[in-house]
């Protein structure tokens, strides 16, 4: 597809949804191609790489389409970071909400760097923020300018499926997060 969506067709692909013509029409085009909803690209060796979901695309105020997962995947490997949600739909630039790792990564980092451990304390600690900024800067050096994170906020709580930010399979509920953290998101656009 022109928009980067992965489409598949062949004898191994289902012909449609069982007893659901409506879902079949939504998923299959008139030529029989199954629209997966995944965004993909082909690398230099000819391998297909999934880079995000079509429904998760952000469109900046300049009309640029951004797959947030691609940027998030460059930042998330840092020991401090548990979750990250890149935002910027309809905005001039991208920002991010960052949640510290509550499964031991942040605690271990705090011990190694002589920082008092608590999610609340660390979210405000300049040493922690500087370490995350370094990771963001490294990620920014690997992507196009339009994909770069200009600002971020470290949140003082963890995201879970029970608190509403994650699905039971621990995927981000982007719309819920945008609603719950609207104030924090808007604060990143007030001065820039």
Regions found by a protein language model. Give the residues of each.
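Conserved ATP-binding/catalytic segment of the ANL
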Residues: 1-60, 77
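Conserved adenylate-forming
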Residues: 1-3, 11, 92-93, 100-114, ...
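Adenylate-forming
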Residues: 13, 28, 47-76, 105-126, ...
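Conserved C-terminal "lid"/linker of ANL adenylate-forming enzymes
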Residues: 83, 133-192
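Generic, well-ordered alpha-helical scaffold segments in large soluble proteins
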Residues: 20, 27, 39, 74, ...
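C-terminal boundary motif of the adenylate-forming
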Residues: 39, 77-104
